[in-house]
Amino acid sequence: MAGSTFGTLFRITTWGESHGPALGVVVDGCPAGIPLTTDYIQAFLDRRKPGQSKFTTARRESDTVEILSGVFEGYTTGTPISLVVRNNDQRSHDYNNIKDCYRPGHADYTFDKKYGLRDYRGGGRTSGRETIGRVAGGAVASRILECLGIKLTTYTKAIGPVSIPSDAYDYSVINENRLYMPNSEYAQQAAAYLEQCISDQDSSGGLIECIIEGMPAGVGEPVFDKLDASLAKAVMSIGAVKGVEIGDGFSVTSSKGSINNDSFISENGQVLKQTNHSGGILGGISDGSSIILRAAIKPTPSISQPQKTVNTAGENIEIAISGRHDPVIVPRAVVVVESMAAITLTDLLMQNMTSRIEYLKNIYL
């Protein structure tokens, strides 16, 4: 199976299946001397693990991380970092009645067409549990970014029709509700909406927003590895993501150049922008202002309502999916989006060291 490695200089390779013995990641290209502990990585994994509220799957997994290599006495050694998380609460029998069915909204049919066989137990590699490796690798990248003064703030902007206006954000309450929304009142409204979805045996999608602060100007690799293109690819590779926008995104289609252009000013010897419609990126290169990224998350495809589909014999059938499934995946996907953004930024920062001879001289002379 190709496509399980992401990155150029800072790379992650994820492995494992939803109902296999374990999942994990190998992180390559991490510099030596970065402080890193299991507790630090665990804090990231805890943000995505299941069973933390009525709005997540009831599957009970501690998602406890083990560091197998690449860290010694609390610091990275510069060698590959191997991280593993054991599966403990698989219930594969939940899938026996649908193992020969193509579940609507899932990758069952396409995997059959590509490989000629598939792991029907929870979707195998297509399961949301695949993101464990992304988050563990993202924790390593985030630790590097912290050392460089770069901060990522990621949260749920919308669940279903409940969307928080930008002028109503309160970042201090993001971790005070299980939906990771930056407004307590809107979090309550979203919870009520999700209660109705559960009652209707249905699910919801939503919108995740990531704000990146402290990113220096000049990072990004034109033409095909632009910063925004790289971020979009990274985030779009997450199974539940159906769209990515940077800055004003799709709303620019109804704007004008006189409005959309961000005017520059010089202040205390610094070049600044008066607005940030571009979302911190111009020409595929960071401009020094905050990078603003949003990811559209589709409704969880596993629902208990009867749905029409086809089985592997080509017969028209109707199924209702039982088992333990999230009515909304958005809150658990927040840290996944953040992790993929962190991995992308770390990789491009390392690539940027080759853009000027002065950078190499600073290292070697």
Task: Indicate where each model-derived feature is located.
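Alpha-helical support elements that line or immediately flank enzyme active sites
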Residues: 21-33, 128-150, 225, 229-233, ...
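N-terminal, positively charged regions that mediate nucleic acid binding
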Residues: 1-59
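Glycine-rich, N-terminal phosphate-binding loop and its surrounding beta-alpha-beta segment
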Residues: 44-104, 108
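Glycine-rich anion/phosphate-binding loop at the beta-strand->alpha-helix junction
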Residues: 15, 21, 201-204, 208-316
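Internal helix-turn-beta structural module
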Residues: 11, 302-365
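Short acidic, glycine/tyrosine-flanked loop/strand segments centered on an H-E-D-like triad
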Residues: 99-124, 307-325
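Glycine-rich, mobile lid/loop segments that gate access to catalytic sites or pores
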Residues: 113-223
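A short glycine/serine-rich beta->alpha loop
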Residues: 11-14, 119-130, 217-221, 276-281, ...
